[in-house]
Design a protein with these regions (language model features):
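N-terminal binding-site loop/beta-alpha segment at the start of enzyme catalytic domains
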Residues: 1-72, 128
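Conserved, mostly hydrophobic/aromatic
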Residues: 7, 19, 39, 47, ...
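Acidic (Asp/Glu)-rich catalytic clusters
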Residues: 8-11, 40-41, 61-71, 91-100, ...
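Active-site mouth loops of central-metabolism enzymes
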Residues: 17-30, 75-85, 114-118, 145-149, ...
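Short, acidic/polar
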Residues: 26-39, 83-98, 148-158, 228-233
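Beta/alpha (TIM)-barrel catalytic core signal, keyed to glycine-rich beta->alpha loops juxtaposed to Asp/Glu
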Residues: 55, 110-287
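A short, structured active-site edge motif that brings together acidic residues
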Residues: 70-82, 104-108, 168-170
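Active-site groove signature of glycoside hydrolases
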Residues: 94-117
């Protein structure tokens, strides 16, 4: 059984593996059903989607209706930066999901400095999120980010507004960058101090695609594929107490990530992770 932990100060106990519903963005109905059966079997109770994830919200809607909406901590995201566009997208997401509220609404990939100023300004997306919370359409508000600046930008966001959660890349290869590691550690310390939930992504990254990305690729990076490699990568992330791991967008690798988290084990040593890096030729996704 995948263990649970408090999701920050929200009062919800979430499985430490969160279903990244980006995996449903291009999935057929049959593939989506198989993925959601795995979610059910492993008793995942936290689902993370986004308005920009293709058909993901639509794929979740009938499954939520059939399995009991209130059994799940449901999160979505808006990538809009202005008030009106974000407010419209929030309501559209609720309609697509077939629900009257979500538990967590996140400002999606808010790392660009100019976009940050718009979103956090008086006529920005944050205002729409707060109004949605006040109206009972969302319960909590978070912020997500990709790239090397995400941890530092999240610290800046937390100084401006008491976000309930953050999400950023966290894996062995990325954390070998001293500047990124220092920013991540500072963010983690701030989140622990303030009761902010920490979600992590890109746990099973092998590196950027070499050459042109395959047309059928489910992830925009090349993932690890062997179960033993995924075991090490997942155990390393979950070896950091209190943080959560959002599963990758490759639906074919979902079972391996779930199996790794369910079996658990001690956190791999630095030597073990360096050996994995060297044997597989792992490289940072963000530089």
């Amino acid at each position: 059984m995948i263990p649970q932990a408090p999701f920050g100060r929200t009062g919800h106990q979430s499985r430490r593996l969160i279903f990244g519903a980006a995996a449903l963005s291009r999935a057929s109905e049959a593939d989506a059903d198989r993925a959601l059966e795995l979610v059910t079997r492993h008793q995942l109770d936290h689902l993370d989607t986004a308005a920009s994830y293709g058909d993901s919200e639509l794929r979740l809607a009938p499954w939520l209706a059939g399995n009991g909406r209130d059994r799940f901590f449901l999160a979505t995201k808006t990538g809009e930066r202005t008030y009106r566009a974000a407010a419209d997208q929030i309501r559209r997401s609720l309609a697509r999901l077939g629900v009257d509220h979500v538990d967590l609404l996140q400002l999606h990939n808010l790392v660009d400095a100019a976009e940050w100023e718009i979103a956090m300004g008086p006529d920005g997306a944050l205002r729409a999120a707060v109004e949605a919370r006040d109206a009972g359409l969302v319960r909590f508000i978070g912020v997500t980010g990709h790239g090397t600046t995400a941890p530092a930008q999240h610290q800046r966001s937390l100084e401006r507004f008491p976000f309930d959660s953050v999400l950023f890349p966290y894996n062995w290869t990325q954390l070998r960058d001293p500047a990124y590691a220092a920013a991540a550690d500072a963010l983690l310390a701030l989140c622990a101090e303030r009761g902010v939930a920490v979600q992590t992504i890109k746990s099973i990254t092998l590196g950027p695609w070499e050459g042109e990305r395959p047309a059928d690729a489910a992830t925009w990076y090349e993932p690890l594929r062997e179960q033993s490699d995924i075991d090490l990568a997942v155990r390393w992330v979950l070896g950091r107490p209190g943080i959560f791991l959002n599963t990758a967008s490759d639906i074919g690798l979902l079972a391996k990530q779930l199996d790794a988290a369910a079996r658990g084990g001690t956190r791999p040593s630095d030597a073990e992770m360096d050996a994995l890096l060297e044997s597989r030729g792992m490289t940072p996704l963000f530089v």
